């Protein structure tokens, strides 16, 4: 299951984080997938193939199907009841209030250097673009590594 876990849009807290400033190495060393940022509970899976594509951070999630909660969350993702992911990051190492980095609606700073700590599958994340994507025609999950599927996803004429 491929999730977009981050893009550079303004989050619900009013700030944004530049993808170019992301340090993904700490996460790659311990690629836990949590449910709703609950780090006091066992992970529900692990992240693989952590990568940056087109200004977004994508992670392939492998759910722990041997774990009851992991299996339950995997089922909800498979059936389309959960589609969102969220990054858990350490407090930014560098931020900027440079107006050139601000987007419309942005009230807070821009994090220019930050470290990814974990990723979570969650009902509602603070970045509304951090989603698993589904094809409107088939209601099946889009494989973000499939170029043709992305073309269909972005072709607005065929969505309605």
What are these regions (language model features)?
Residues 1-152:
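Signature of dsDNA virion morphogenesis modules
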